[in-house]
Amino acid sequence: MLKIQFHLAWHKAGAQPHRAFKMPGAADWMGEYAGRIGQHATCTIEGGPPKHGGRLWLLDHGTGSLVLSSEELAEALRRERDAGTDSLAVLIGGPDGYSEAAVSAMKPALRWSLGPMTLPHELAAVVAAEQVYRAWSILKRAPYHLGH
């Protein structure tokens, strides 16, 4: 079973995930979507950068990031699943994002953006989690996505 780890770059590794969120309700929403993803894959929320050799998806507002539709994200997730990926880290940057040198060193399998708008990093994390859950819903043809 695929393991998906949301890594919150602004949060200290090993600290309680709910403490990463100062916006009222953001931790609840993040936990809600992580739980929903957990119906399809093992899902965790962690602080700091990933420390494993798995695949990396980088949510980044920078130049070169792909703006994907929900269906395109679902297709990327399907490719990971079908390729036998066992661990997928979704890294969400902090308020300052990443330098091009840092992104280059990470070598992400997917560098994606939620669009040209600037969002608070906590909200971006929640939206990313919702979109990963929606991607699973698309792949499973679940009612969550139908009609949207």
Regions found by a protein language model. Give the residues of each.
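S-adenosyl-L-methionine/SAH cofactor-binding core of RNA-modifying enzymes
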Residues: 32-89, 95-100
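RNA substrate-binding interface of SAM-dependent RNA methyltransferases
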Residues: 1-60, 137
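Residues that cap or initiate secondary-structure elements
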Residues: 10-14, 63, 96, 118
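Conserved strand-to-helix beginnings and helix N-cap segments that scaffold or border functional pockets
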Residues: 23, 70-71, 125
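Structured adenosyl-cofactor binding patch, chiefly the S-adenosyl-L-methionine
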Residues: 102-148
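Short glycine- and Lys/Arg-enriched binding-loop motifs that mark or flank ligand-binding interfaces
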Residues: 89-90, 137
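Intrinsically disordered, low-complexity coil segments
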Residues: 13-24, 64-66, 82-83, 103-110
